Amino acid sequence: MTTAVERKYINIRKRLDQLGYRQTLTVECLPLVEKLFSDLVHTTESLRQSKLSAVKAEKESANFDFVLEPYKLENARLSRENNELYLELMKLREHSDQHVKELKTSLKKCARETADLKFLNNQYAHKLKLLEKESKAKNERIQQLQEKNLHAVVQTPGGKKRSIAFRRQRMQIDEPVPPSEVSSYPVPQPDDPYIADLLQVADNRIQELQQEVHQLQEKLAMMESGVRDYSKQIELREREIERLSVALDGGRSPDVLSLESRNKTNEKLIAHLNIQVDFLQQANKDLEKRIRELMETKETVTSEVVNLSNKNEKLCQELTEIDQLAQQLERHKEEVLETADKELGEAKKEIKRKLSEMQDLEETMAKLQLELNLCQKEKERLSDELLVKSDLETVVHQLEQEKQRLSKKVESFAVTERQLTLEVERMRLEHGIKRRDRSPSRLDTFLKGIEEERDYYKKELERLQHIIQRRSCSTSYSAREKSSIFRTPEKGDYNSEIHQITRERDELQRMLERFEKYMEDIQSNVKLLTAERDKLSVLYNEAQEELSALRKESTQTTAPHNIVSLMEKEKELALSDLRRIMAEKEALREKLEHIEEVSLFGKSELEKTIEHLTCVNHQLESEKYELKSKVLIMKETIESLENKLKVQAQKFSHVAGDSSHQKTEVNSLRIVNEQLQRSVDDYQHRLSIKRGELESAQAQIKILEEKIDELNLKMTSQDEEAHVMKKTIGVIDKEKDFLQETVDEKTEKIANLQENLANKEKAVAQMKIMISECESSVNQLKETLVNRDREINSLRRQLDAAHKELDEVGRSREIAFKENRRLQDDLATMARENQEISLELEAAVQEKEEMKSRVHKYITEVSRWESLMAAKEKENQDLLDRFQMLHNRAEDWEVKAHQAEGESSSVRLELLSIDTERRHLRERVELLEKEIQEHINAHHAYESQISSMAKAMSRLEEELRHQEDEKATVLNDLSSLRELCIKLDSGKDIMTQQLNSKNLEFERVVVELENVKSESDLLKKQLSNERHTVKNLESLLATNRDKEFHSHLTSHEKDTEIQLLKEKLTLSESKLTSQSRENTMLRAKVAQLQTDYDALKRQISTERYERERAIQEMRRHGLATPPLSSTLRSPSHSPEHRNV
């Protein structure tokens, strides 16, 4: 038993030593250790078997994964394609929705435009209908008036009443009445540039802020529409995600689903972040623009604030300086009095100088008044001459009318003589000797009529001679002028001379108006100088009164002697104050010197302005001399015209002597007739030239001629009436020639009138130039007046400031006197100074009395000048009214300036609010920039992680290869070990120790292998996850690129569509413009056709009227007419035949 126990103990001890258990082993715990050791061996064997089964299961699972892998790939490809197709469908839907919206907006615009065009078309059609109705009514009215004005009844010398047609009375107006040359003078308006600039700045700022508000509102509307679109897109995407999640839930592993959900969430986050990045970039751009604008406004505001602060500092400095000046003026009143006396002396000198200038101006005014009187006398003389000339013109026109009527009568007489001779010969041929005793009676009546008319014209000529002789007795000048006018052979000379005289008259009137304006300007200047003189006199009196009051106050400031004993202790303090006062006195002297320099500078400026006014006066005098020279030239021209009139009067006397004989009259009329025939030939030549201009109206004339031809064809069916119409047509041709002559005369008259118009237009242009020069001079004078007013206002302000300073000086003086009562030594010195001041006051009183005497003399002179200027105050009252109006306007402008200041304060408050908003926006921008920077950093971190993971993947793949190689080697070793174990089972007892050690080593290696396998599994999982993430990232990149590409394509397509729409708009606008142009062209054509139609109607009516008049004149003169021809052809019905 002991040997068996010992053997067991030795075996167990060895095994424990082999396994590394070195602890002590007692005999009592030997059975327990045996059991534990047997259990350990059992567990190791079971572990070995489980590992083998696990290896087999892994091999089977690897085979299963290899079989399922192509199905997984195919399923993933199909799902990806499905997702891409669905994304494209969504994009197409969005694009179609946007396109539909744009088409709807364009359709609405087109509908509005079509509605507007329809409305305009209806309006134009309605207007055309109204115009057509009005034209029809007017045409009917014209026809009615023409029918009313066609016929009239005239009693012929034979006692019969015949109806003749009168020409329609016409009134040809070449041009409207010329406008009045003298327009209302522009009222000068004072312009304050500071107020205008502030108002303009405020208005501009308000407009800019309103524009910014509108732009922000538009951007907000755009952003809201974009948010709506994006919300719709997000809803569609979420629906798609839900659909895909439902589709992919069945038969998928939870890991894959979780990974896909993570990828989807990551994609959503990335898309959302991209959208936020884009939105934030756009917001950054807008905010940068806004910040720039606000910075600019801030700079402007800061500049304004700096300017205002500088102004405030300057004002503070000026206030301190004014305080110092007040103190110095208080302590040094004597020097102030001396400077005031000096200024008064200078003011006296200026008053004397201005009085001398006023005297010079009055002398010039007197000279100009004399010249005005002379010019008015010349004007009256010229007006009388113009009246005489107008009478002569009327006489000349009457003579020309009589001459034309006589020429017409002579032509009608010649025609009637020819017709009578023809009738006599025809009567002789038809009726023989029986008709002889009838024709002489007609000739006798005709000759008697001619003699009566001759006697009538003789009487008219004698009456005209009697009128001319009577007017020649009244004034020799008018008689000469009349005779010269009667002797002028042509009307063109009369018109040219009359137009020259009228032109000269107009020029003289303009010269007089200029002189009157110049006199008014001089009077206004004199009035201004008198006003300034009165103001200076008032200021001088006020200054003297203030000086006397100051001196009285200085005499009354003697302190009582009782206070002297109480003030001895304060002597030292008073001495220190005196020293300080002396220092301030020196500073005050320097200030006074500076003020005197400023006053001298202002005086020099005033002297410069006076020199400028003297230069203006010299220029006006030079203009006056030029006008005098022009008047002399006009007189010379008038004398030359009088000589011409004398020569023409002599010629007219010769003509009047020759006109007593009737034969000479007939010869002269024949010569005139020949001249008229020559002029008719010339006018026919001119008409042939002008017929080229009437080609546009020939189409309608041809239509009328065709109608006339048709009527002629109808008339040819009647042979008897055809011969009569031929004769009448010959007569009408003759009258047509006569009318052509009259037309040519009218064209000559029109040419003369056009020349006169051109001359008048030239004269009007010269007058306009002169008026513009006068207006410029008036504006300059107004500017000088405004400058003077500003200078007067500045002087008033300075006087107010001086009064305020004097008041402050008085107050500070009272305080100083109270302090001086406490002083003792100063009282003695002040007593001495008071004595000296009393002496100076006596001298000042004497000077005041002298000044009073001078003032009385000055008042007498002023009263004399006021008596002289009393007559001119009525003329200057209008200028005072204008000045009051200007003053009221200035007050209104001041009120507006205050309003503008209030508005500027409100604008400043708005700017402050805008600054606060800008600060908030800046803070927000900074926060957004920080978020963007964080996103960018995260993006970089993701990229760095991806790169590190790729490197780790490559490293792990290499390690896996090494481990697989090691695994293969280990498996080979295991197989060799198994073979050795099988071989060594027989020698189990011998190799137990070796087997135990090897088993332990094997177990250790197995543990390490399991660890390696678990690590490899984990690495595989990590690799698969990383590959999946890489694929997801690549798909995200691809989708982002596709999105960008599609967005680029959509933007390009939108741009092309916008360009197409713009081209369509331009085409529609061009069509509208072309249609409007065509409408205007058609209207112009309609107007031209209407005018042509009216002209042709007038021509037809005149031709009808002339034909009827010719027929009636032929009937009146007894020519062969259609009814006469019928009487001649049928002698049995005539009364003469009955007598036979």
From Swiss-Prot:
Region (Homodimerization) residue ranges read 11-64
Extent of Low complexity compositional bias? 1121-1133
**TM region(s), chain numbering:** none
The organism's superkingdom is given as Eukaryota
Family matches, as InterPro entries: Centriole_BasalBody_StrucProt (IPR051877)
Positions where Phosphoserine occurs in the chain: S383, S439, S688, S1130
Identify residues that carry Phosphothreonine: T1121
The UniProt GO MF terms for this protein read: identical protein binding; microtubule binding; protein homodimerization activity; tubulin binding
Q: Which residues does UniProt call coiled coil? A: 75-151, 199-416, 447-644, 668-1036, 1079-1113
Query: What is this protein's function?
Result: Centrosomal microtubule-binding protein involved in centriole biogenesis. Acts as a scaffolding protein during early centriole biogenesis. Required for the targeting of centriole satellite proteins to centrosomes such as of PCM1, SSX2IP and CEP290 and recruitment of WRAP73 to centrioles. Also required for centriole-centriole cohesion during interphase by acting as a platform protein for CEP250 at the centriole. Required for the recruitment of CEP295 to the proximal end of new-born centrioles at the centriolar microtubule wall during early S phase in a PLK4-dependent manner.
Q: How does it assemble?
A: Homodimer. Interacts with DCTN2. Interacts with CEP250.
Q: What family does this belong to?
A: Belongs to the CEP135/TSGA10 family.
Q: What is known of its domains?
A: Coiled-coil domains are critical for microtubule binding via the formation of a two-stranded coiled-coil structure in homodimers.
How is this protein named in the record?
Centrosomal protein of 135 kDa
Q: What is the lineage of its organism?
A: Eukaryota, Metazoa, Chordata, Craniata, Vertebrata
